[in-house]
């Protein structure tokens, strides 16, 4: 065996590469003990002292957890003083002193096949002493501790087998010369390196370094070169450095290169400390700020407690927010806003104005229903029964509403993927509300808005209430009449003093659910001024594609109105803004007939009034004839509000007579009794003549109060050939009269009229001059009255007519035929001329009216002339 070959130890990063101070390794596994014994007996005098061995280092490879324990010797990751403390920990002890050649089954020893597995440089070590702990019978070693020093850095040359034991390998080495002298290195540089290492608090300095520094200071024989080597090599073995960093420093053969690289490593640690210090300063600043805020908040709490106030309000809100119901009801964005405002309120002085504003805002956020809904009653039979019970007549209207609700019920029951309402306690939660991805569902689930158009008192509001009751919805009414400020709908911004949310949000807060029926009353009576146009704000509310994201200025959060059933009412369809009209579905309600009013009075009004006044029905014996008298002579309306007031007045007067005991025991409410209680009749039938008159013809009119008759009078006076119009006629009606006169003049010969138009003034008057009148539908009535006056032929008082006339005598369609017909019916008209184009509207006329009145559809005026004057 060559003299420069050595047994070797495969080391890990815990071996000090060039540390000249004494180190220790503990062995306790049987195989390592066996190898040590062979090493012990390798000379004539058995010993381990002063024997040399190599410490070799494996090359860095990818980690293989399966071979980790068999390929790398494990040492404690700390300095040499800790080896003795860890000798009882098998995993932290050295496994083998000799490397073995070959591959042996069940071997825990490192397997070294050639030098390519090892790093180029190794450490030559000498055993200084050893301590062996033997078995009780002194025959076997159990634990061996080797004390050694690294004597030299060497280069590996060849791996060879031991002839005596082929299983054991040895390595041939050669010395390595390391240069140290350089003008770049002097004692001050080493001292600076030591100072930087001390300041880098995260860089661990081996304790051996103190011995080297002390030795150099106390022993003048300890040369500068030895000092430089000792400091450099000891710092290079710092536990703070990684194994690759340690070996890289070990591999340099020039101490200037080692010191330069070591300086870079320590400088990196110093920069890390600097960065950590900066971060700590920032953290301390933030912590100081938080502590200051905490102290101030605690002081505020103490002050509030001293003033008799506490934080129960904020605690109650937080408790609600974290409750099971709160987690389900409040959307995430709303919950964040509530928490933010609650924290803001905690830091405020209670008496400050801002505190009151924030508290009012929090009250609204907590009071709104958000995802809370009321479960609908999806029963079409129940809807029909409720409407029949609540209203008499209005069959067509009931059909429209039932069809509408049936479609709604069917759509909801057949909707795919919609989960059932979640019940939390006694409340229902709709998880489909306030979803971010619901835009794509809008068109398939959009519901048109119902708008009931009709005269006052015809039951628009009561129908809406009946619908809400029928499908189990909460009902709330919003009166829009006279609203001129857009903020009434969208709310005021919180920056304004006395700011409030809009009527929509207030209504939802009032009912406490997000799926009520909201009645928008008098939608046709909204106005606009310099404060904005509220009808424009209503566009967002009534548009199913927008109301899912309705924003109130006060709330400043989106509110989902998609589950609200809106029902609007109006008296006149022409007064509804066109953009709004485009978003709603119109259902028209017309005047009640006399028979309907009588039945309504008997079935609804009289029982309701008697109940309100706690009067026994036996004290209100009334017949249909008397009710009809009340309707005709004490009311003039399309609905029944006035009739209810008249009945209520009669009931009160009967109660007075009961208390005064002046009421006959067998009295009956007849026409004379009514006159006694109410006085003379307030209304007579419209001024319809009782006999045919020359120059007077009955026309038909329509107003928000319903239909009525109007007399058109024509007389001739000597004068210039001209026309005079009186009776508060507006432009369209004046033009209609002039067109009728021009038509009659052009057809005078055909009508047998021989009249001096150039020297005669024709005066046309429509009575009740205080009432403005407009519209083209009196055209044929003007023509008939003019012909009657010029030809001196009377027209029957039982005939009425409505229709626009052209210069060629064509009769054009008109609107409001049903209401006009009801006005004629109330005044005893028997024959009505209507435009042929309106014949299709006769289906809307009640049968009881058609049984009394004859309708004659005409295309041209000639047909009317032939019927009346020939």
Swiss-Prot record:
Active site positions: 777, 820
Single annotated GO MF: ATP binding
Residue intervals of the Lon N-terminal domain: 1-270
UniProt keyword annotations, A-Z: ATP-binding, Cytoplasm, Hydrolase, Nucleotide-binding, Protease, Serine protease, Stress response
UniProt-listed SUPFAM superfamilies: P-loop containing nucleoside triphosphate hydrolases (SSF52540), Ribosomal protein S5 domain 2-like (SSF54211)
PROSITE patterns: LON_N, LON_PROTEOLYTIC
SMART domains assigned: AAA (SM00382)
Induction info: By heat shock.
Subunit field text: Homohexamer. Organized in a ring with a central cavity.
The protein's name in its UniProt record: Lon protease
Organism: Mesomycoplasma hyopneumoniae (strain 232)
Lineage: Bacteria, Bacillati, Mycoplasmatota, Mycoplasmoidales, Metamycoplasmataceae
Gene designation per UniProt: lon
């Amino acid at each position: 065996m060559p003299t420069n070959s050595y047994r070797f130890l495969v080391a890990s990063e815990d071996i000090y590469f060039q540390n000249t101070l004494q180190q220790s390794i503990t062995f306790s596994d049987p195989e390592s003990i066996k190898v040590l014994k062979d090493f012990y007996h390798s000379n004539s005098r058995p010993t381990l002292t002063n024997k040399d061995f190599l410490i070799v280092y494996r090359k860095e490879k990818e980690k293989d957890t399966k071979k980790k324990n068999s390929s790398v010797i494990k040492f404690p990751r700390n300095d040499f003083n800790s080896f003795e403390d860890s000798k009882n920990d098998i995993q932290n002890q050295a496994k083998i002193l000799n490397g073995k050649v070959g591959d042996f089954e069940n071997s825990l020893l490192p397997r070294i096949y050639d030098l390519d597995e090892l790093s180029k440089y190794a450490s030559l070590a000498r055993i200084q002493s050893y301590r062996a702990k033997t078995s009780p019978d002194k025959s076997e070693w159990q634990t061996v501790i080797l004390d050694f020093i690294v004597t030299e850095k060497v280069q590996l040359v060849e791996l060879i087998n031991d002839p005596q034991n082929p299983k054991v390998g040895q390595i041939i080495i050669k010395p390595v010369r390391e240069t140290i002298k350089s003008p770049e290195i002097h004692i001050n540089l080493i001292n600076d390196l030591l100072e930087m290492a001390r300041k880098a608090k995260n860089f661990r300095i081996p304790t051996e370094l103190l011995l080297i520094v002390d030795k150099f200071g106390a022993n003048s024989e300890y040369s500068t070169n030895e000092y430089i080597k000792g400091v450099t090599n000891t710092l290079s073995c710092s536990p703070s450095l990684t194994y690759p960093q340690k070996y890289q420093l070990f591999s340099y053969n020039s101490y200037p290169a080692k010191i330069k690289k070591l300086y870079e490593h320590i400088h990196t640690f110093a920069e890390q400390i600097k960065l950590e210090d900066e971060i700590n300063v920032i953290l301390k600043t933030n912590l100081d700020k938080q502590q200051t805020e905490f102290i101030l908040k605690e002081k505020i709490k103490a002050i509030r407690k001293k003033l008799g106030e506490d934080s129960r309000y904020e605690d109650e809100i937080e408790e609600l927010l974290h409750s099971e119901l709160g987690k389900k009801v409040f959307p995430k964005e709303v919950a964040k806003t509530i928490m933010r405002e609650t924290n803001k309120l905690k830091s405020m002085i209670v008496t400050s104005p801002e505190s009151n504003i924030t508290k009012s805002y929090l009250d609204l956020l907590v009071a709104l229903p958000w995802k809370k809904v009321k479960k609908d009653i999806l029963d079409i039979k129940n809807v029909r029964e409720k409407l029949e019970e609540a209203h008499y007549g209005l069959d067509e209207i009931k059909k429209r509403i039932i069809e509408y609700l049936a479609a709604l019920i069917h759509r909801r029951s057949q909707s795919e993927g919609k989960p059932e309402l979640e019940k939390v306690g006694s409340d229902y939660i709709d998880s489909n509300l306030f979803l971010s991805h619901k835009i794509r569902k809008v068109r398939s689930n959009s519901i048109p808005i119902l708008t009931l158009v009709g005269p006052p008192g015809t039951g628009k509001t009561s129908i809406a209430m009946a619908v809400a009751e029928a499908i189990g919805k909460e009902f709330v009414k919003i009166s829009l009449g006279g609203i001129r400020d857009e903020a009434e709908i969208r709310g005021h911004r919180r920056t304004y003093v006395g700011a409030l949310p809009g009527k929509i949000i207030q209504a939802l807060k009032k009912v406490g659910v997000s799926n009520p029926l909201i009645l928008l009353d008098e939608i046709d009576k909204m106005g606009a001024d310099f404060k904005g146009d509220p009808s424009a704000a209503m566009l967002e509310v009534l548009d199913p594609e927008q109301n899912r994201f309705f924003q109130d200025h006060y709330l400043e959060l989106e509110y989902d109105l998609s589950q609200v059933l809106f029902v609007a009412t109006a008296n006149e369809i022409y007064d509804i803004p066109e953009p709004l009209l485009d978003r709603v579905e119109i259902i028209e309600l017309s005047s009640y007939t006399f028979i309907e009013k009588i039945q309504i009075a008997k079935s609804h009004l009289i029982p309701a009034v008697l109940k309100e006044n706690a009067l026994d029905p036996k004290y209100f014996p009334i017949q249909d004839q008397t009710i009809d008298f009340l309707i005709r002579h004490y009311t003039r309306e399309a609905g029944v509000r006035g009739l209810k007031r008249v009945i209520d007045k009669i009931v009160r007067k009967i109660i007075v007579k009961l208390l005064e005991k002046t009421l006959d025991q067998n009295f009956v409410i007849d026409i004379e009794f009514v006159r006694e209680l109410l006085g003379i009749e307030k209304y007579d039938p419209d001024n319809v003549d009782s006999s045919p008159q020359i120059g007077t013809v009955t026309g038909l009119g329509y107003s928000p109060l319903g239909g009525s008759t109007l007399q058109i009078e024509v007389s001739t006076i000597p004068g210039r050939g001209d026309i005079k119009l009186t009776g508060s006629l507006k432009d369209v009606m004046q033009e209609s009269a002039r067109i009728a006169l021009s038509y009659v003049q052009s057809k005078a010969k055909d009508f047998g009229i021989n009249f001096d138009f150039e020297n005669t003034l024709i005066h046309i008057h429509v009575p009740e001059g205080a009432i403005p009148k407009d519209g083209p539908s009196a055209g044929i009535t003007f023509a008939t009255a003019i012909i009657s006056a010029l030809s001196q032929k009377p027209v029957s008082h039982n005939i009425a007519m409505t229709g626009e006339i052209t210069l060629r005598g064509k009769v054009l369609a008109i609107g409001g035929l049903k209401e006009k017909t009801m006005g004629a019916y109330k005044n005893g008209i028997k024959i009505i001329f209507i435009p042929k184009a309106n014949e299709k509207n006769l289906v809307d006329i009640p049968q009881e009216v058609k049984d009394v009145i004859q309708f004659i559809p005409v295309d041209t005026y000639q047909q009317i002339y032939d019927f009346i004057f020939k």
